[in-house]
Amino acid sequence: MLILSKLPKTWIIDIDGTIFEHNGYLKGKDRLLPGVKNFISKIPENDFILLITARTKENETRLKDELREFGIRFNQIIFGAPVGERILINDEKPSGLSTAIAVNVKRDSGLNIEINYSDAL
């Protein structure tokens, strides 16, 4: 479960193995993983969603079409990301609020993550 502040956020979400089946696009068409639509629907409209993928820019039109077809909203996509670790470094708020959170999910298991927003953070 994610317990988050009510401040606007930036969500950085990998595509393959997280939103769509890993390398599914190589078999023809992407397959949406369980819980993804529900998870994305719980992200407030004023939050920024940045998707990231190792897919090349040549896949842009097809990928954006499939995301829209499945109703997955996003603000921006980074293509051609390396396949290694993704590292986020951010400062901590003076209040002590951690502004960098990492969630690792098992490949192709979907996004069955509960989100709760707290006034206390």
Task: Give the positions of each predicted feature.
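HAD-like aspartate-dependent phosphatase fold
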Residues: 1-121
